[in-house]
Amino acid sequence: MKLSTIFTAFAATIATVAGYETTGSKQTVDILIDYIIKETPELSQNDVANWENGDTVTLQYVVNNNEESEITVVGVTGQFKNPINNEIVTNLTTGKVGPIAVPPGEAIKFDQKINVDLIPANYELIPHVFIAQDSLIKVIPCRGQLATIVDAAVSFFDPRLIFLELVLLITFAGLIYVGYEIWGKQYFKGVAPVKAKKVSAAKASSPVASGPSTTSATGYDTNWIPESHLKQKKTKKVN
């Protein structure tokens, strides 16, 4: 079988797939396909995988060819379904594989990486493998895997969160400054206490005359001098 024929048939099959079911009558094939999740190989079909948005899940397939003729693995795809009503939520991007030839009675392995980015909920992952055999492309569904998908927890030290915190902090500080310049200054001017003027000690302690004062010939006020002292001065002058 020519590789160009395989790829042409593969492309034509993808173009005519409706809901990932081939058109025409279904055929029974003796090809066994299973897979494990590399990140959690202990999970079985009866377990529920727990994934976070942003995770990359690696499916490792094992294809056993029990047919009498050679088969070729040429692609892989899949879908996430609602496990309750079986409705398709999203389809996985179709990926090219190999092509990898599998002789009768032999098995091969290959990987598929899936980037998880869905609305947090419960899903069922159902992969599909494209097999080329006798110039025909066959789409073989694999077992389903139940999975719970949640959003990843945001770390306080996440650079995106730190940047957002800085932007909010700068914005908040800017609003406070503008508010103070517009209203704060005027408000504080109106409620701020007025400082009393200080009077110097010299002015505060100087006596204030309460009555008329007389000045003697000597040039000073004699009202405060005792009379006896003044009489003694006059007596001395007479003598």
Swiss-Prot record:
It comes from the Eukaryota. Keywords: Endoplasmic reticulum, Membrane, Signal, Transmembrane, Transmembrane helix. It is found in: Endoplasmic reticulum membrane. This is Increased recombination centers protein 22-2. Residues 183-239 are cytoplasmic. Residues 201-222 are annotated as: Disordered. Belongs to the IRC22 family. The keyword Plastid does not apply. Is probably involved in a pathway contributing to genomic integrity. Residues 20-161 are lumenal. Coiled coil: none annotated. It comes from Candida albicans (strain WO-1) (Yeast). It holds the Pfam family TRAP_alpha. It is a single-pass type I membrane protein. Residues 201-213 have a biased composition (Low complexity). Its main location: endoplasmic reticulum. One of its GO terms (cellular component) is endoplasmic reticulum membrane. The gene is IRC22-2. The chain crosses the membrane at residues 162-182. Residues 1-19 form the signal peptide. The lineage of its organism: Eukaryota, Fungi, Dikarya, Ascomycota, Saccharomycotina.
